[in-house]
Each structure stands twice: as structure tokens, then as C-alpha cells.
Amino acid sequence: RDRNNAMTNLNNALQDKTETLNSINFTDADQAKKDAYTNAVSHAEGILSKANGSNASQTEVEQAMQRVNAAKQALNGNDNLANAKQQAKQQLANLTHINDAQKQSFESQITQAPLVTDVTTINQKAQTLDHAMELLRNSVADNQTTLASEDYHDATAQRQNDYNQAVTAANNIINQTTSPTMNPDDVNRATTQVNNTKVALDGDENLVAAKQQANNRLCLLYTSPSP
């Protein structure tokens, strides 16, 4: 009878096998701990099978149950997920180029992430966006210098306007407090627009052309025959 009770207890220990295998505590556990649990379950199922069960002693049955329970208790997926989230949030806090709204969005995503792999992906996205934001901030860092330059001052009105609009769009992204831009491609496009419109400023060329025209007029005056 004791052996029958032991077999019942062993069977009960496997009742939550499917639930356990589908849990975060198993999915995100260390591989060795996952293997220990699945091996313990396989061993227990072998004992419970009619083909092999009759050969197992009461002690072996009890040991199999203890092995299943111990392996299940040792699963550390929940701990691994919590640790991954904590580390990701610490790394997020150290990013200096994304704005607060972007940072809060990533923090919320990390909190809600169901798996360690999701946390890793979010962390990588944050790093990528931070780099894009660094380039965007750099593109407008010399805005005041550019506005005071001859290249801007003597540029055609359309090119001045193009540059001003690009800088405004960039600053709008940088200074967002709600609904932040989270796609690095959008940030990179804004950076490219600032850089391209800055390069396109033609004030220096216009000044050179104006000087050349003035020189040409002077030459014509000096070389024109007297009436």
C-alpha cells in the first residue's frame, strides 16, 4: 500500500508538468536547470508507465518524486527575467542622448516584457535610438554659428527656409515630452535633412558671384571708350 501511495504522489507531482513547461520560470531558466527538470519528468513518467513501473521499488518511486519537485523548485526563469529587467533599466538610465519621453517609453516596455529575449531586444533598440539621437543633437549643435555665418546670411531665401525648417523638425524631436519618436530611421532622416540643407546653403557662393559681378562691372567701366 505504501508503494501505491508513493506512485500516487509521483503522479500528482507531474500534474502541473504542462503548466510548468509553459511558464516563464521554465522558459527563461538556465539551460542546465531546464534539462534537470525535463530529465526528472521523463524518469518519473518511465516509472509510472505500466511497462516499467512494476520494476521500481517504493524508494525509487519516492526518490523520483523528490527529484521532480527539487528540479521544479530550482527553476530560476522568474529570477533571470527580473535580473535582466533590472540590468536593462540601469543601462537605460545611463543613456544620455534620448529624451525623457523616449526613456520612459523604453522603461515601460522593459517592465512589461514577458521574456529575457524581449528585454534584450528592447535594450538593443534603446542603444540604437540613443546613437541616432546623438547624431541628431550634433547636427543642430552649431545652429547659432550657422545662422551667424556668411554662408547663411547671403544664402537664397529658399535655402535659408529649408535649413530653418529642418532645424525646427530636429528640435521638435529632441524636445518631445509626449508621443516620442521611437523609430531610429525617423531620427536619422531628420539628421540627414539638417546636414543636407546646411551643406546646401549657398551664401558663400552668392557672395563670390556678387563680387565677381562687381569686378566685371568695374572692368567694363574702366575699359569702356570715353564718349
Predicted features, each with a name:
Residues 1, 15, 19-25, 65, ...:
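Generic ordered-secondary-structure signal
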Residues 33-40, 84, 100, 159-166:
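Short amphipathic alpha-helical heptad-repeat segments
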Residues 26-30, 154-156:
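Solvent-exposed, low-complexity, repeat-rich "mucin-like" stalks and linkers
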Residues 1-10, 45-83, 106-137, 171-208:
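Repeat-associated, polar segments at repeat-unit boundaries in modular proteins
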Residues 222-227:
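Conserved small/polar residues in nucleotide/adenosyl-binding loops
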Residues 5-22, 77-96, 131-148, 203-221:
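Disulfide-bonded cysteine-rich modules in secreted/extracellular proteins
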